[in-house]
């Protein structure tokens, strides 16, 4: 992988490596090495029964070594929609997938679902189109590794903030403050919220 990054740098080609070994900070030496996987990503939430707490641990472990391409954006989480014989569902929710764009840093982000899925969930896909990929400021508002994490980030060069909060399999109420925001300003918020308390489907959500 290092050799590929070196040669790619000579030709001014960006690299996003998957199945790579653990990150060692060499993306600073080779800034064209934009991101890498180096941990279990979204596909394992479906095919390997990845536990929900996995992504609440990554910010304290894998992401210390550099940007991670987690390949988020799976909005159709129930497999029977595509194949009635498959009764399983991915260990995630639609809104949690959106939150990954904030909680799992990468300057190169994916929209990993099918185009027709994004047509069906157009308002959720709008968030993927709108969310920044680089940031001026980052605040960890609350966190407990293995349980939950809530992160607030300011879009680079813009007066736009994005907040992502994820949890394990247990629902919870986040207690956060916004005292880091400039005083005397008003903000308009678009909120994407799971309806896990009122609906059994992990794809149900509300955007307000």
Q: Model-found features: residue ranges?
A:
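Conserved, mostly hydrophobic/aromatic
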Residues: 15, 103, 163
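Carbohydrate-binding surface patches
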Residues: 145-183
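Conserved small/polar residues in nucleotide/adenosyl-binding loops
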Residues: 197-202
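Solvent-exposed beta-hairpin/edge-strand motifs
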Residues: 181-193
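Edge strands and adjacent loops of beta-rich recognition modules
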Residues: 131-150
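Catalytic cores of secreted or luminal carbohydrate-active enzymes
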Residues: 100-136
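Acidic/polar loop patches that form or flank catalytic/metal-binding clefts of enzymes
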Residues: 12-19, 42-47, 109-118, 137-139, ...
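Aromatic- and carboxylate-enriched substrate-binding clefts and catalytic-loop regions
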Residues: 1-91
């Amino acid at each position: 992988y290092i050799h590929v990054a070196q040669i790619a740098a000579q030709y001014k080609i960006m690299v996003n490596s998957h199945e790579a070994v653990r990150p060692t900070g060499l993306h600073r030496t080779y800034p064209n090495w934009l991101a890498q996987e180096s941990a279990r990503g979204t596909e394992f939430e479906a095919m390997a029964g990845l536990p929900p707490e996995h992504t609440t641990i990554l910010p304290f472990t894998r992401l210390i070594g550099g940007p991670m391409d987690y390949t988020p954006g799976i909005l159709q989480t129930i497999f029977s929609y595509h194949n009635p014989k498959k009764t399983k569902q991915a260990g995630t929710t639609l809104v949690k997938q959106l939150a990954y764009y904030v909680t799992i840093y990468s300057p190169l982000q994916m929209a990993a679902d099918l185009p027709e899925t994004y047509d069906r969930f157009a308002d959720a896909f709008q968030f993927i189109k709108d969310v920044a990929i680089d940031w001026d400021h980052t605040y960890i508002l609350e966190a407990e590794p293995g349980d939950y994490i809530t992160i607030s980030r300011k879009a680079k060069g813009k007066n736009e903030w994005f907040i992502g909060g994820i949890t394990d399999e247990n629902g919870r109420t986040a207690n956060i403050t916004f005292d880091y925001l400039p005083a005397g300003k008003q903000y308009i918020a678009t909120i994407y919220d799971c309806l896990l308390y009122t609906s059994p489907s992990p794809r149900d959500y509300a955007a307000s």
